[in-house]
Amino acid sequence: HRAQGDDVTLSRFVQPRLDEKLPYDRIYGSAIFSWSRGKLEDLQNAWLGAMVGGTGWDTEQTVEAVIREPEYEYYDYSIYPEFPYSLGFTQRGCRLNCGFCVVPKKEGKPRSVNTIKDIWRPGTPRCVVLLDNDFFGQTQWKERIDEIKDGDFRVSFNQGINVRMITPETAEAIASVKYSDDQFKGRRLYTAWDNLGQEKVFFRGLTMLNEAGIPSKHVMVYMLIGYAPNETMDEILHRFNRLNEAGCLPYPICLLYTS
């Protein structure tokens, strides 16, 4: 819309505010998670004709479907003027098929979509936030790693690395780049341990990272809680304590916890 000369306003409110310039020609709403569905329904009630979508609504109504383009990678940074970095995807899709995740259904098998050069905004810090769900699932991951190193970029693997699929080669590749947290204030690598049954394969991957020179203290581990059937508090604490003992930073995600 902005490219067509339209004025665009970003709002996190579903109801009209007193200071808003009305009326709007188009209203769009998007939600990431399904528990926000009620807010999208409120948006539709408040703004007749509003177009809604996102993974919290359904997986059919996408930006790409609306504008009839295969991939949409053109970000309007002007709506976040204080954000100094660059962000985007070098790949889409995922090799895994986790029951709680919409990515395989929405994006399919892994494929390369952009280079680091495509993502980085010249004139801004050489800091790139990658939104890839399975960076090493793409066939061109070596080219992207070389591009990160050759360009002296700092990179945040924001959506995490699949530790269950780490190999000595990919661990060495991660260690060879300046991986950072998403604020670029320190060294951080994100991954996940979703259930107790993954214990052996998780620590196998962590060991490979350690052997490549990545210390456990750099690794933040998202702990999904409440999704595994009949999960007990003892099992949850076992994961938490093992991560602490290994020197990792556990990050419990209790969004699905119900009892």
Where are the regions a protein language model picked out?
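Anion (oxyanion) recognition and catalysis
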Residues: 2, 149, 210, 241-244
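Short catalytic/ligand-binding loop motif for oxyanion handling, primarily in non-cytosolic enzymes
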Residues: 36-38, 58-62, 96-100, 107-109, ...
